[in-house]
Design a protein with these regions (language model features):
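Beta-loop-alpha module in the N-terminal Rossmann-like domain of NAD(P)-dependent dehydrogenases
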Residues: 15-77
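Short loop/edge segments at beta-strand edges and connector loops
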Residues: 21, 62, 87-89, 146-148
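Short loop/turn motifs at secondary-structure junctions
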Residues: 29, 56, 108-113, 140-143
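NAD(P)-binding Rossmann-fold cofactor-contacting core
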Residues: 1-12
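Short glycine-rich anion-binding loops that position phosphate/pyrophosphate groups of nucleotides
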Residues: 38-41, 90-91, 173
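Contiguous beta-strand/loop segments that form the cofactor/metal-binding neighborhood of enzyme cores
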Residues: 124-194
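Short, flexible/disordered intra-domain loops and linkers
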Residues: 1, 39-48, 176-183
């Protein structure tokens, strides 16, 4: 589904797929829709488009970030229309992230203790950052000891997750006219072991 621009027409032609200009044109026998359009959290209509698909009984993967109220609304429509909803998981499938998580699992299984985490991310990619972090430490309670005031584009946080100390650098700045760009940092992780 696209607005029918020259770019979307060329894309559909290149991949040999039909181009629909509204969700209502999409046949009901489609299994899943991947919605890579900004959600309401970023001023877009990706959530509304997702809900239109869900109302048709078509499962949806929606690109992050998504506000928690929008997620709840999408789950409600998925449940009532007997289909599935999830947010995208792009970063967890990147080779570098998979390799890091694999090494972390290997060390954990060998009994090597994770001593400290130094990490950073941006507001645009914070949801997947938290997901990756959760997989590094296998969940747990977060204890924030200190959150700095905003310094330029960044904030810092210090604390621990179930006893594993951390320091996070967070790029807390987004250009409202171009929210997909201008990140100073995407994801960075430095893990210290015994």
């Amino acid at each position: 589904v696209a607005r029918g621009s020259e770019r979307s027409q060329k894309c559909a032609e290149h991949y040999g797929v039909p181009l629909y200009e509204s969700v209502s044109q999409v046949p009901s026998d489609i299994d899943i829709a991947c919605v890579a359009i900004r959600t309401g959290a970023l001023g877009g209509n990706g959530t509304e488009i997702s809900i239109e698909f869900l109302k048709k009984g078509i499962s949806v993967i929606l690109e992050q970030p998504v506000h928690h109220k929008e997620i709840a609304e999408c789950f409600k429509f998925a449940r009532s229309n007997n289909c599935c909803f999830m947010t995208g998981d792009l970063y967890l499938n990147m080779p570098e992230i998979r390799r890091m998580l694999s090494v972390t699992d290997y060390l954990r299984n060998k009994g090597v203790k994770l001593e400290y985490i130094r990490a950073g991310s941006s507001v645009q990619a914070f949801y997947p950052f938290v997901d990756i972090l959760n997989r590094l430490v296998r969940g747990g309670n977060v204890n924030l000891e200190y959150v700095s005031p905003q310094r330029g584009s960044f904030k810092e946080a210090i604390g621990d997750i179930s006893g594993t100390p951390f320091s996070f650098e967070f790029n807390n700045d987004m250009n409202p006219h171009d929210p997909d760009n201008h990140m100073h940092i995407l994801h960075t992780f430095t893990l210290y072991y015994e």
